[in-house]
Amino acid sequence: MGLETEKADVQLFMDDDSYSRHSSVDYADPDKFVDPGSDRDPHRLNSHLKVGFEDVIAEPVSTHSFDKVWICSHALFEMSKYVIYKFLTVFLAIPLAFAAGILFATLSCLHIWIIMPFVKTCLMVLPSVQTIWKSVTDVVIAPLCTSIGRSFSSVSLQLSHD
C-alpha cells in the first residue's frame, strides 16, 4: 500500500499512522452516526470477533499485488462485511433475540423453581444419608473386606520347576 505511481484523476495517500486498523466502516464525521455513550458490548463478550482485512488477507513482501487491486479488495472486503452483516441482522436479529429470550426465560424458570430447590433438598438430606452410609460401611462392608483380606493373606503360592 502507499502512493500510487500511475497518473490518475484521484490519488490515494495512505500512511500507517492515519490508516484505520479497525474493522468498522469509517465515516467522514463519525459523531453524526455513532452515539458515544451507547456501548453495545460493555462486557466485551465478542471482543474476539474483531476481524480486519489484515487478519484475513495478507501478502508477504515478496509477492505484492498492484496497489489499486489491494485498495479495491480492501474496500470490497470491508463494504461486503458491513453490508452482509446489516442484511443478516435485519432478518435474523429479531427472531433470534425472541428465541434466545424464550430459551433464557425457560432456563431461568427451571433453575429458580426446580433445580435450586432440588439441590437445597439434597444438601439438607445429605448429612442424614452420610450418617446412615457410614453406619452401613462400618457394620457390613468393613468386616466383609477385612475377612476377605485375611483369607487372601493366608494364601501362599509355591512354584516348582519340573
From Swiss-Prot:
Top-rank taxon: Eukaryota
Major localisation: nucleus
PTM-bearing positions, type Phosphoserine: S20, S23
Intramembrane segments: 87-107
Compartments where found: Nucleus; Cytoplasm; Golgi apparatus membrane; Cell membrane
PROSITE patterns the UniProt entry points to: CAVEOLIN
Quaternary structure and partners: Monomer or homodimer. Interacts with CAV1; the interaction forms a stable heterooligomeric complex that is required for targeting to lipid rafts and for caveolae formation. Tyrosine phosphorylated forms do not form heterooligomers with the Tyr-19-phosphorylated form existing as a monomer or dimer, and the Tyr-27-form as a monomer only. Interacts (tyrosine phosphorylated form) with the SH2 domain-containing proteins, RASA1, NCK1 and SRC. Interacts (tyrosine phosphorylated form) with INSR, the interaction (Tyr-27-phosphorylated form) is increased on insulin stimulation.
GO cellular component terms, semicolon-separated: acrosomal membrane; caveola; caveolar macromolecular signaling complex; cytoplasmic vesicle; focal adhesion; Golgi apparatus; Golgi membrane; nucleus
Positions carrying Phosphotyrosine: Y19, Y27
Name of this chain's protein: Caveolin-2
Cytoplasmic compartment residues: 1-86, 108-162
GO molecular function annotation: D1 dopamine receptor binding; molecular adaptor activity; protein heterodimerization activity; protein homodimerization activity; protein kinase binding; protein-macromolecule adaptor activity; scaffold protein binding
Tissue specificity remark: Expressed in aortic endothelial cells.
Keyword Transmembrane: no
Origin organism lineage: Eukaryota, Metazoa, Chordata, Craniata, Vertebrata
GO process annotations (BP): basement membrane organization; caveola assembly; cell differentiation; endoplasmic reticulum organization; endothelial cell proliferation; insulin receptor signaling pathway; mitochondrion organization; negative regulation of endothelial cell proliferation
